[in-house]
Amino acid sequence: MAGPTEEIIDDLDMISKLSKPIKELNWLERSLLFAELAKLSYYSDSQVTKVFQAAGIGEIQFIEHDGAQAYILGTDDDCMIICRGTEPGEWNDVKADANAFTVMTEVGRLHSGFNAEVDDLWPLLEQSVEENQRPMWFAGHSLGGAMATICAGRCKMSNIPSNPSAIFTFGSPRVGNKRYINFVRVPHYRWVNNNDVVTRVPPTWLGYRHSGQEIYLDSDGELSRLTSWRRFSDRMRGVGGALLRWEIDYFADHSMVQYIHHIQNALDQHRCGKSDYRLSHPLLPEVTAT
């Protein structure tokens, strides 16, 4: 579940700017915001503090314990928890990804590696937001998406006065069994880019399930709602196109650069009134004017 820094972005600017509460953004604008924050979470606070501030984020706290890392970001209106994804050079991250056994919790079975990462981080996170009363938003890419999902679940059970508003994940693996997924009743926008291989692990035959509303980007990078057969055909088309570009689609599609590019295109189409049936499909979240 790779997210090496040099692969994430060459330019540290943000398109999104926070000048109003996040709840007043439509779901595509929120998705772009959290995709950019998930991408920037791979950088040190010294590298991204000015970027966050320029985007309207005044509160910036980086927390880390035993290789598990996250940013706690805040404005006057919102609190955001952005979990960092896998860094191949971090043994703790690699170990977390590889450990696919489940561990029993009071609300269901969880991936033991992902749960251990949150165990490392949770005391610091809970202490930092224990008096927060602003809406809380959770996001992450790859391993960070799994951690964000688990953190949101723990937030629901904690004494933190503010409940999670939503989770936004990009290329996230499955995190737990059906019982756990049914427990995490938090709006979850789960982005999947065509052949992103990380979204297919751990396997369902081990009891793992995905949570939330899947938002699928097809081989053309457009929002789609496809049947199983059409999705298989679309994925094969994606593999073929990648081979022509001398790329391995399963890994190329996991890049946050691609996620951000496709979400930005979808948002631009909406703003220009060029949304097609895929964008307004009733099974996808509604896009409302702002």
List the predicted regions and their residue ranges.
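Non-catalytic, mobile gating and regulatory segments of ester bond hydrolases
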Residues: M1-A139, L143-T290
